[in-house]
Amino acid sequence: MRIVQVIPELNEGGVERGVVELNREFVKKGIESFVISAGGKLENQINLDGGNHVKFDVCSKNIFTAFRRVKGLKKILKEINPDIIHVRSRVPAWLVYFANKSLNIKVVSTVHGFNSVGFYSSIMQKADAVICVSNSIKEYIQKHYQTSENKITVIPRGIDLELFNPRNIDETFIENFKKEFDLKDKFVVSSVGRVTQLKDYETFIKAILLAKKEIPNVVGLIVGGVRSDKEDYLKSLKSLIKELDLENNIIFFFFLSKIEQIYALSDVVISSSKKPESFGRAVAESICMNKPVIATNHGGVKDIIIENENGFFFEVGDDKELADNILKSRTLKFDGYGYISDNFSLKNMLDRTLEVYRNL
């Protein structure tokens, strides 16, 4: 079998990581794997893992170059001659739609998010099979596009059970990290994700203030990069921290490397997103490391968290409810690794994706 995945870019992100992981697993199974993208930080990993990265602009929304790019993509697809084209985003889906007109290769799309409703987004439903990363996404596209039930398969994102394994903790990294940020004997409440308004870090910070009344040694750890256009938002968060006298209780770590070790050193992980997450990869990864997760009560995370067992939900913007759940999280004991292994493994994602391909 020969598979082509098409994605706008290969920079760091949940969708991109999923493409890299599938490429690696395809190769292990003897499948010829190709990834077409405009490139990025992760493009070399495709080739290192035994796949084939083809650099081509499937990212730009410029309609004036679209015709030229459709012709170029058609030539690439004819040369590769794949059994399946798997599109991961709307621009690639439109380019593939026109490039594939005379090639008639079977197309699979994965809907990764709650995209704006309209003609532009409807392209994802034109594929021969549609994969949704959560039941929330499935309900969303069925509501807005009336997509046929037998065309849709829900396949949650797969978690790398070797990387996110509580038995594979890097004690040296954790010891050095705790020493650098003075986290020894602290109750660490982490939140992972780019610093943007959608992550609602204001609510996270206010909840730390409330939790501090009962947990004096609490520390909020915000982990994620900051784009240049979000610098003002970061400044506003730092002003809020100063205003609430939390400068010794909130830490920013602007890198997403060694994220599995960040989960390992945390006591609880928070997802305070204002916008529903399509799946909630960070939630599943945290639980896999046996860490409770508290998340806003919407989106794909509702498929992952079992309330009062491995985490809790709170309403968007409710810092008091979040703080109360932080306190309650101290009593939770569970086998998160076993739960994720059974329900959200990379193997499960791979096997079910291949099943979709073979049924076309």
Regions found by a protein language model. Give the residues of each.
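Short alpha-helical donor nucleotide-sugar binding micro-motif in glycosyltransferases
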Residues: 77, 255-256, 262-266, 281
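A conserved, positively charged/aromatic
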Residues: 101-135, 139, 146
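Conserved donor-binding/catalytic core segment of Leloir-type glycosyltransferases
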Residues: 4, 183-199, 205-208, 221
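Active-site donor-binding acidic/aromatic loop of nucleotide-activated sugar
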Residues: 229-234, 247-256, 262, 313
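Short His-centered aromatic/hydrophobic patch
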Residues: 87-93, 111
